[in-house]
């Protein structure tokens, strides 16, 4: 399969960089590589990912089909018999595929009629939803919260299944397995092990946008047509037999969490994901009587509805909301029923957490073996993996959890027998020990945060006699947290008559998550405390995500990371994929689709008052520098039309700057810098405390620009406006980045991260002692700088969002003039970067925007 000759079936005329992207992507997948792709926003990255990967997939399926036909049994038979056998096999496969496509085509026509007539199956839907309400109202019996008898102390065996299916009844599990791989379904659909693409991104809105792009593309079928002579037309050159041509729309399913996909109103209203998960599992437990189970869950009675759900999902490309509506129409839980679709899909879209967390993959019966993984918006992938496997618990939560356990133990004292009584007492003892340690930390005034030795948490009386491995299994198998929370919730609602939703995480679930991390520590995990007023937060933090991602990488055929700003890429090579053999990892950085004349990028090391801009932590409080900053921004705003967005390194520094700008410049009654800025452009700024939400702030900003006044928006790197917000065209003619948002290197957490990187680098390095230490120190410094520069690059990427866009990007700090920092900027920025004095920079801005304005006027004429 030669990617250089491919058209990739792009719905438009692709840019050269898109063609390069698609070819490199195709090659990476074909050669089973790990690829990192950087392509700026506005360059059509999503369509490049779709066209490159699905072109490869259809080619691969076509090759498998042809190989399967050629490798027919009976090679010792006469050639005419072999030819007949191959032709017959082609006919059977083609007819099977045609039956599928015809059925899905009928569904598409039905859906079109449904939309036109606006007909919905409201009575059926209401009946199903009302059934769900009635069944849920029967869950308040005290007996539902009693612990099952527990005696699974054998460490070698356990009844616990790591998958969430462990709580389902045997009939439900059997049905799910049947629906995902029955002979009848496999006769018509792709087999379970057919290669597919798993595409994930940060949010469901991004996945919905991806689905919209997916609808634009049409690919040739995976089964090639035959010529009139009965030969397979692999080149597309012969006269085709019309009966052998197939239409094969892309098969897609979008997956989500229970919180996203649940259609049971009384479960959905719980609000919190953990509470929804636990209530859902409660209603599917094998111990629940049939009449009390969730009516939307798969069962023998609604098997036909599940098949109907599957066909409707596969008939067209749907986003997660569409799939929820299909579930409501068919009366089937989309979360569970989607499993019957995964095996028959070509591309599966899902949010980060469902792909990156093994327990989530197990819950959905997702196997990554020999499939293709594409992770979009992957610039923060290492942080995302670390956050998924990190957990916090506060002293307040521990106290509440201990109180709830005490109430529960008293209520069920007579019924708690044997191992249940022993283990509940052990959990209470462990919580008490951890709480006691945190109380001592709170009482000590000298430190606000620091590292925690795990042994300090286990210093309570009798803790050394607890077998943490057994207790960990007990917490998972007994469902203690669920039982206790259910009882507490039931008691509270009965007394206070307050059945409204609660969006907070149930305390004992949070406590249990922390305890499980504590009992099963990763070699890459560390414990920290952080004081917050009269409370203390205890944090289990994963320092290195490599091991948690490695299993997925080694299972998959190929792994693709893509993003608009993946630079600097050295962290992926040196840390996330450090175990890969040379040549197994490939990196690609593509330029922008805009001409270089549409970008003015300048480092600004001095202001118009000739103050050096040095926004390091030690020097950024200089009043003179902050005043010069304001005056310089004012001059830049005069030269820049429409919207200007300025990013500060932190909320604290932004607030400090604004306070100084509010003060009069002298005693002569001159206006403040803030007033002066307001005369040039209306001024808005992001604040943690401000009541105005992000949408309202952006709308106000856009309104000023639409009115022709322009606007200056002060925001924060790493804040709400620095990621996922498009400041295209007039919204972002100027982007100013002020300083470098380095994390607090003195914090215990960052000290631990850097020490970990240095130690791993030292262990991997060769050479003498001094050389190894030098490499380790350099690696730690790089890791620290790269974390900062990823945030900077995200801010820079907010502007210039399409081919005809243009903007000026100015980076205020002397460090932006150094080769080391510039090397960590995206390539398309580096190519346009010019250093000049501030006077020349401002003069260039006037010229730059005057030229752009004259071009726009000419176009309008």
Swiss-Prot record:
[4Fe-4S] cluster binds at residues 262, 280, 294, 333. One of its GO terms (cellular component) is nucleus. PROSITE patterns: DEAH_ATP_HELICASE, HELICASE_ATP_BIND_2. It is an enzyme of class 5 (isomerase). Residues 220-250 are annotated as: Disordered. GO terms for molecular function: ATP binding; ATP hydrolysis activity; DNA binding; DNA helicase activity; iron-sulfur cluster binding; metal ion binding. Residues 4-428 form the Helicase ATP-binding domain. ATP-dependent DNA helicase important for chromosome transmission and normal cell cycle progression in G(2)/M. May have a role in changing DNA topology to allow the loading of proteins involved in maintaining sister chromatid cohesion in the vicinity of the centromeres. Has a specific role in chromosome segregation during meiosis II. It holds the Pfam family DEAD_2. It catalyses: Couples ATP hydrolysis with the unwinding of duplex DNA at the replication fork by translocating in the 5'-3' direction. This creates two antiparallel DNA single strands (ssDNA). The leading ssDNA polymer is the template for DNA polymerase III holoenzyme which synthesizes a continuous strand; ATP + H2O = ADP + phosphate + H(+). GO terms for biological process: establishment of sister chromatid cohesion; nucleobase-containing compound metabolic process. ATP binds at residues 39-46. Residues 236-250 have a biased composition (Basic and acidic residues). It comes from Coccidioides immitis (strain RS). This is ATP-dependent DNA helicase CHL1. The lineage of its organism: Eukaryota, Fungi, Dikarya, Ascomycota, Pezizomycotina. Belongs to the DEAD box helicase family. DEAH subfamily. DDX11/CHL1 sub-subfamily. Keywords: ATP-binding, Cell cycle, DNA-binding, Helicase, Hydrolase, Iron, Iron-sulfur, Isomerase, Metal-binding, Nucleotide-binding, Nucleus. Its cofactor is [4Fe-4S] cluster.
